[in-house]
Amino acid sequence: MTSNTNNGNRRNFLKMAGTGAISAAALAAFPPSIRRALAIPANNATGTMRDIEHVVILMQENRSFDNYFGTLQGVRGFGDRFPIPLAGGLNVWQQTYVPSSGPSRVVLPYYLDSSAGNAQRVSGTPHSYPDAQNAWDLGRMSKWPTYKQTQSMGYYKQAELDFQFALANAFTLCDAYHCGFHGGTNTNRLFHWTGTNDPTGAAGGPVIDNSGDHLDAGVTYNWTTYPERLQTAGVSWKVYQNMPDNFTDNPLAGFKAYRDANAARGNAKDGSPFPAYTPADETISPLIKGVGNTMPDGGFLQALKDDIAAGQLPQVSWIVAPATYSEHPGPSSPVQGAWYTQEVLNALT
């Protein structure tokens, strides 16, 4: 994370919050869910990772860092003093757009102003392996609007992302994290859930597209996933999702081990009729909680809230949002994703 005065102020803020020295006015600037999170004393009995009791992971969809946080003070965004140089004396912010017909033109980053239109609903961009590789252009970084369309140069400010900016200012934001793979959704989610896309093809890969992102897909993967490793190590885990609508964002559905668990539960190949998960299902297969209908309320987190209230939150949890709250351009929006993230934080605090 970039180090500067703003980051120093954030660290000082968190230190003051931990000692109770922060003013009520400063805390009041944050949403209630963030205020409650900041008010919880840190469990730092040993000062090591052993103090971590629960890890809850929510991965949202298809937003670049600069699309959200390019204007946030203190990060390497649009204020970067050393932008990547391009051919012809341009830099990476000056992208040449070559349309299918008509003259080419330079496209600069532009503000998606919600006061001037429905910027929350800007359409999505292509996000598959071929267009990602072409936009990257062997590292030249010069063809983003040509292959990702001109809206790939659009960005939001705090006015559109009030909750996301509050999260970034209250906690840690990393400005140099990148996709595991120049490609689409499922491949990167495979890195998230398994650490690889099987590049050598030893176990069903290499995965470069979304063809295996549902239970009844024609392709099958056979390498070991993180949940399986946790299971072997005796670490409790669970995937919280609504199986009829997880926006096909759970890549575990592509693995034979999880499909076998689905079949043992008596479900059809596609998971239907999507029976509500119960702990008794684990006697059939512990992996069913990776592809079962663990949030039958439509994905609105009631099962997560119930587990927390009962003291049964697993040591490691993944949450997969339904399409409307996935933050993916098109079916979702920044404000809908913010609401969902806030609900997760509300449940945890």
What would you call each of these model-derived segments?
Residues 2-349:
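N-terminal pro-sequences and low-complexity stem/linker regions of secreted or lumenal proteins
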